[in-house]
């Protein structure tokens, strides 16, 4: 496996060098810069596997850097870990709304940072593994059947090996794209892909926020906030649901959590 490339965008040189030394000891390749604009340029040039991003910086802050990366087709899928002195819950929520994958507050434990980096990279690497979907063609909805036929024409191997299908929604595990009946093809961020993949791979199951934090994103027990899950669910619904206020794909079961359900095909 090739060495992962980590880009550190941090204006505090001492903090930046400390992170660099620690991650270099774990055999990561490191690039550093002290401002957001240069960070975006470096990311475009080198396509890092992960960005560690400070919030408070000169010129443009970390939130704006994150938003620009998420709106850039070349950079939109790169995982981003916010590292900042901002500790209020609303600051964390703002970071996730901007598109962050994880959030660590200063002062931080350098070993915890390394573990979070490794967890994010593990989640990203899972995307390379195709999952076998055993649902037969006769059970596909008309929309899903059309998508599956189009994908099969592009591939030499059975398309069922690299897709998950629930109702009208088709997840392509090779391209990390979700085909939806109202928004067409949607390219998911790594954290959105992991969430959708887990739910679609377990249709009908209920997942509490704590269970999703543990099973999808490798958060240790009793860590992570349910608010983070709600933000990720909201962002995802905004992208894939016909009416995010009345979701039909990812449903909320009050008091229990979230689920996707396989509806019967009547045609």
Language-model features, listed with the residues they occupy:
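Receiver (REC) domain active-site loop signature in two-component systems and cognate sites
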Residues: 57
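Two-component/phosphorelay signaling modules centered on CheY-like receiver
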Residues: 12-32, 45
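Active-site beta3 strand of CheY-like receiver
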Residues: 46-52
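Conserved Asp/Asn-Gly motif in the active-site loop of CheY-like receiver
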Residues: 33-37, 92
């Amino acid at each position: 496996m090739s060495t992962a490339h980590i880009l550190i965008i941090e204006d505090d040189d001492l903090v930046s060098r400390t992170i660099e030394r620690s991650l270099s000891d774990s055999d990561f390749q490191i690039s550093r810069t002290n401002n957001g604009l240069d960070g975006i340029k470096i990311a475009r040039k080198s396509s890092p596997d992960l960005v560690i991003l400070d919030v408070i910086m000169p010129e443009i802050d970390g939130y704006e850097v994150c938003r620009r990366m998420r709106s850039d087709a070349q950079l939109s899928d790169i995982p981003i870990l916010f590292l900042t002195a901002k500790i209020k819950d609303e600051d964390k929520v703002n970071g996730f709304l901007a598109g962050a994958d994880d959030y660590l507050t200063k002062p931080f434990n350098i070993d915890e940072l390394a573990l979070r980096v490794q967890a994010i990279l593990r989640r990203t690497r899972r995307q390379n593994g195709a999952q076998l979907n055993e649902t037969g063609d006769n059970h596909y909805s008309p929309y899903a059947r059309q998508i599956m036929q189009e994908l099969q024409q592009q591939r030499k191997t059975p398309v069922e090996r690299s897709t998950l299908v629930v109702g009208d929604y088709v997840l392509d595990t090779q391209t990390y794209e979700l085909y939806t009946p109202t928004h067409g093809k949607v390219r998911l961020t790594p954290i959105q892909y992991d969430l959708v993949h887990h739910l679609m791979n377990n249709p009908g199951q209920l997942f509490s926020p704590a269970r999703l934090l543990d099973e999808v994103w490798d958060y240790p027990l009793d860590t992570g906030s349910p608010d983070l899950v709600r933000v990720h669910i909201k962002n995802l619904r905004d992208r894939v649901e016909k009416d995010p206020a009345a979701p039909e794909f990812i449903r909320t079961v009050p008091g229990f959590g979230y689920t996707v359900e396989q509806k019967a095909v009547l045609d």
